[in-house]
Amino acid sequence: MATAPRSLDTISLCSTVSSCPDRNGFYGGFQRTDKPKEPLSKAQIIAREKKWLYMIDNWSIYMSKNYKKIRDRCRKGIPKSVRPKAWFYLSGAYLLKKKNPNVYNELLEKPGNPTTIEEIKKDKHRQFPFHEMFLDEQKVGQIELFNVLKAYSIYNPKVGFCQAQAPIAAFLLMHLPAEDAFWVFVSVCDVYLQDYFIPGLEVIQNDAGILEGLLKKTCPPVYRHLQKHKVEPLLYMTDWFLCAMTRTLPWETLLRVWDCFLAEGIRVIFKVALVIIGASLSRHKVRKTCTGLCETLAVLRSPEEHIVEEEFIINNMMRLNLRVEDFQIEHTRQKARRAKQKAQQEAESSGSGNGHRRNMPTL
């Protein structure tokens, strides 16, 4: 990740950087791709676009009476030309914008918290530094990213600004006008990733326990390996979940995952995580070479290229034998476990005689 603003001249010194952007606007970095995308026929593309446009024109009917059709079409992949509008509707951002006319521009007129503003200024250049929108401070990407993050910090002062939000906002700005991106961002932060960015990160810790429980169900050998070497979920999944995979997956895979994520919610991120973990450590030969915590983390943090390919992730995500009830059961179990831990900590603190209450561990 970059630590200072870079121009194209600066980053061109790196051997992984091209003088021409790829079809998605990347000059370099792991999300650049020079592989040709398998083309659909023009007739197929037009047919899909028409289906989506009709569905969006009748959105409330589909959401109330035929949501399964929306979900299935998202899993198949949203046509590129329709994706911005589809995400705007899938996330519910179109309703937020309708209920809050002119709010985004009004937020931009406000000064904001000085400390938060400085944090945003320091962080904005670090997002997708190899993408044409974010190459330097004068590019529209960095300007709009600052505006969206500043506006949100004022809109939801309870959360303010968290560094993990920045790649999500930048990712959305690559697809949507700034005001629309802001409202999708609000929906993602306040609904899809609700309470993820509150200081203490208690929700992400709870979800780490849920992920561990689901891994035990879906891939017992891998679960046992992680337990044996004391590989805690927070050591490898925090960035995946907090950034909603935006800093983890190749570009085409990320787009497909977000098509599903905005239709089905956080369960999609759980499933993608389970696919990566399971596929990375499913072979006995690989587990045998992972003789400790560090070796195992290295495998999980740098999955093989084929594991994060678009079709592999999507197909294996759909094959996971997980019901909504499985997530609910694990959520209830983790909630009870954390309540018990909290009670024990309070009891220990009370018994120590100094009245000190231990805080939940933070990241």
Curated annotation (Swiss-Prot):
Disruption phenotype: RNAi-mediated knockdown in the trachea results in a U-turn phenotype in which the seamless tubes undergo a series of 180 degree turns in terminal tip cells. SMART domains: TBC. InterPro entries: Rab-GAP-TBC_dom, Rab-GAP_TBC_sf, Rab_GAP_TBC_domain. It holds the Pfam family RabGAP-TBC. Residues 77-265 form the Rab-GAP TBC domain. SUPFAM superfamilies: Ypt/Rab-GAP domain of gyp1p (SSF47923). One of its GO terms (cellular component) is cytosol. Residues 335-363 are annotated as: Disordered. Keywords: Cell membrane, Cell projection, Cytoplasmic vesicle, GTPase activation, Membrane. It is a peripheral membrane protein. The keyword DNA damage does not apply. It is found in: Apical cell membrane; Cytoplasmic vesicle; Cell projection, Filopodium. GO terms for molecular function: GTPase activator activity. GO terms for biological process: lumen formation, open tracheal system; polarity specification of proximal/distal axis; retrograde transport, endosome to Golgi. PANTHER family: RAB GTPASE-ACTIVATING PROTEIN 1-LIKE, TBC1 DOMAIN FAMILY MEMBER 10A. Essential for ensuring the polarized growth of tracheal seamless tubes. During seamless tube morphogenesis, likely to act as a GTPase-activating protein (GAP) for Rab35 to regulate vesicle trafficking from the recycling endosomes to the lumenal apical membrane to ensure the polarized dynein motor complex-dependent growth of seamless tubes along the proximodistal axis in tracheal terminal cells. This is TBC1 domain family member whacked.
